[in-house]
Curated annotation (Swiss-Prot):
ATP binds at residues 17, 211-215, 286-288, 335-339. It catalyses: acetate + ATP = acetyl phosphate + ADP. Keywords: ATP-binding, Cytoplasm, Kinase, Magnesium, Metal-binding, Nucleotide-binding, Transferase. Belongs to the acetokinase family. Mg(2+) binds at residues 10, 389. The active site is at residue 151. One of its GO terms (biological process) is acetate metabolic process. This is Acetate kinase. The gene is ackA.
């Protein structure tokens, strides 16, 4: 049977991740990443099947466009045999606005909606658009086989009592100001993976999914659907993150303008790039480094304590949204959620009140196929499930192409 490969692109302002996946067999062929954009420090492409690695270090590019073009050129030069088997291209899109509720074939109308929503995802949507336009020109035969998979789609099931803010209703009606959420692709994936591990249908599954990384969000999922999530109009709301502030008193912004004479541009940069655990610790946004300094650096300890406290508060709060108090599991995912036993321990320590207890030994074992559960025998389930957004994007892309008779 002819292989059906999907090229997946995940573009942000500071990194580009890409992969080629056999959507039928679920096999990863190519995995690549470029970190930072201006003066890119490295670009790595791995051929998983043949165990070949291409590394470009100290690459100097003066534009995002040139970086995407470089990635395309390297793929065509070294991996053209795989490109010939590609049947579609999936693009992760962070924000789709209020109207988009599912993955869509990319056309002029969809591009316009992505552009319109860029105000809510300035670190992502503009870069998605640059990449899409280049891909459409480079892969001409697949021009009608590009699919946008939206992070916000999974959260479109939230009720108004979850997504509306306590501001005049007219702001929602006139300007679409409401909670949209993020990380929906992975929260969707976690929902389906968790249903397999718990041997329950997604329609009967009630969980709290904790995507913890440099950007973090928590989602309350009832009967397999998102009913509330910590990120809001933008990915700035919610948990304290690597460099993002999370929930703050809105008057802080007014104070910064009126009393401290900060400009809107300065405030945006502070809240998105200089806050979070970086701002609190004054040393780094890297949670691994903060963990190492936890017992020797007061502000490193403070940053982690504040992060974990906020996560615990959200989990406890979302547990109250479960029908008849029935919460099937807490799931940890994302770079921190998957890899930091230390942070998981600190978070769960505060949740015995809602029936969750950590098995210390299981928590320390590196997550594998046989080690997803990290709770004690008298606890409700606690799982660790590695994120795999690319797998979902590839499947969604394939499904949309099939539905549209491609």
């Amino acid at each position: 049977m002819k292989k059906k490969l999907i090229l997946v692109l995940n573009c942000g302002s500071s990194s580009v991740k890409f992969s080629i996946i056999d959507v039928i067999e679920g096999v990863l062929y190519i995995s690549g990443i470029a970190n930072t954009i201006n003066n890119v420090s490295f670009l790595k492409i791995y051929d998983i099947k043949k165990k070949i690695k291409i590394v470009k270090k100290n690459i100097s590019t003066d534009s995002y466009k040139k970086l995407i073009l470089l990635i395309c050129d390297l793929l065509f030069i070294h991996f053209n045999k795989y490109l010939k088997l590609i049947i579609g291209i999936g693009h992760r899109i962070v924000h789709g606005g209020k109207d988009i509720k599912k993955s869509m074939i990319i056309n002029k109308k969809i591009l316009l909606k992505i552009k319109k929503s860029a105000i809510f995802a300035p670190l992502h949507n503009p870069y998605h658009l640059i990449a899409i336009k280049i891909i459409l020109n480079k892969f001409v035969k697949l021009k009608n086989r590009n699919v946008a998979v939206f992070d916000t789609s999974f959260h479109q099931t939230m009720p108004k009592k979850s997504f509306l803010y306590g501001i005049p209703y007219s702001f929602y009606k006139k300007y679409s100001i409401r909670k949209y959420g993020a990380h929906g692709i992975n929260h969707f994936y976690i929902t389906h993976e968790c249903s397999l591990f718990l041997k329950k249908s997604t329609n009967n599954l009630n969980i709290i999914s904790c995507h913890l990384g440099s950007g973090s969000s928590i989602t309350a999922i009832v009967n397999g659907k998102s009913i509330d999530t910590s990120m809001g109009l933008t990915p700035l709301e919610g948990l304290v993150m690597g460099t993002r502030c999370g929930d703050i008193d809105p008057y802080i912004i007014i104070y910064m303008i009126k009393k401290l004479n900060f400009s809107i541009t300065q405030i945006q940069k502070i809240l998105t790039k200089s806050s979070g655990v970086l701002g609190i610790s004054s040393i780094t946004s890297d949670f691994r480094e903060l963990e190492k300094k936890y017992y020797s650096h007061k502000k490193a300890k403070l940053a982690i304590d504040i992060f974990c406290r906020r996560v615990s508060k959200y989990i406890a709060g979302y547990s109250s949204l479960m029908p008849k108090g029935k919460l099937d599991a807490i799931v940890f995912t994302g770079g921190i959620g998957e890899n930091s036993s230390f942070i998981r321990k600190k978070i769960i320590k505060n949740l015995s009140i809602i029936g969750f207890f950590l098995d210390i030994e299981k928590n320390l074992i590196k997550t594998g196929n046989n080690n997803r559960f990290i709770h004690t025998i008298n606890s409700k389930p606690i799982l660790v499930i590695p994120a795999d957004e690319n797998k979902i994007i590839a499947k969604e892309t394939y499904n949309i192409l099939i539905k549209n008779n491609f």
